[in-house]
Amino acid sequence: MSSQTPVVTVDGPSGAGKGTLCMLLAKKLGFHLLDSGAIYRVLALAAIHHGVDTESEDALVPLATHLDVQFIAEGDLVKVILEGEDVSGELRKEETGMAASKVAALPRVREALLRRQRAFETAPGLVADGRDMGTVVFTGAQAKIFLDASAEERANRRLKQLQDKGLDVRFADLLSEIQERDDRDRNRPVAPLRPAEDALVLDSTSMTIDEVVEKALQYIESKLAE
């Protein structure tokens, strides 16, 4: 068995169920959790809290380098703790999202956040959720999973989520949004969305979450025992 800190990466397109899978894996394995998709929003929120200009690389790089953030699986949710405060609700605000898109466009900030994400690799282990965790951030991870599902299934899941919240949405619109995002993610010049060569590809289209977790755990346990 490897003496290095075990890292499990879960990549895949939007709506495939990565967040739920990672939360459940982190709980079952007793590992730390990294939600890389939220990290730019967290940095943007830290900048807002500290009065830092979200377009200033010089000001943002030290903030990114020392970003004090934790992702904690609790119940059915992942709580985001920034500087000791639960900011899960604030992360979803439009203001935070707009600031995050500015932050994400700055190359030196991206580099600083890449190093900060790698610092999550601490004992007893890490489950990292994202789009390029296995191909860019943790290329040496012992267990890599690429979780996929058809665009139609992902649109159906999103439709149900939004309808459960009382929102009136059309399946065709959601499907179109998902297909456009897939196209952007898979064809972007930097870190395009693709499975790592050594990843287990899991298609969750016709699987329950319990089946996905069981398959993933079997694979992880076999890789960590090598």
From Swiss-Prot:
Q: List the catalysed reactions.
A: CMP + ATP = CDP + ADP; dCMP + ATP = dCDP + ADP
InterPro entries (alphabetical): Cytidylate_kin, Cytidylate_kinase_dom, P-loop_NTPase
Q: Which GO terms describe its biological process?
A: nucleobase-containing small molecule interconversion; pyrimidine nucleotide metabolic process
Respond yes or no to whether keyword Transferase is given for this record: yes
Question: What are the binding positions for ATP in this chain?
Answer: 12-20
Chief location category: cytoplasm
Where is this chain's protein located in or outside the cell? Cytoplasm
Keywords in alphabetical order: ATP-binding, Cytoplasm, Kinase, Nucleotide-binding, Transferase
Q: Name one GO cellular component term.
A: cytosol
For this protein, the record's Pfam families field holds: Cytidylate_kin
**EC class (word):** transferase
Q: Please indicate which superkingdom the organism of origin belongs to.
A: Bacteria
Gene Ontology terms for molecular function: ATP binding; CMP kinase activity; dCMP kinase activity
What span is annotated as the signal peptide, if there is one? none
| EC number in record | 2.7.4.25
Q: Does the keyword Nucleotide-binding apply?
A: yes
The similarity comment for this entry is:
Belongs to the cytidylate kinase family. Type 1 subfamily.
Q: Which NCBIfam families match?
A: cmk (TIGR00017)
Q: Which PANTHER family match?
A: CYTIDYLATE KINASE, CYTIDYLATE KINASE/PANTOATE-BETA-ALANINE LIGASE
Q: Under which name does UniProt file this protein? A: Cytidylate kinase
Q: Which organism is it from?
A: Vibrio campbellii (strain ATCC BAA-1116)
Gene for this chain: cmk
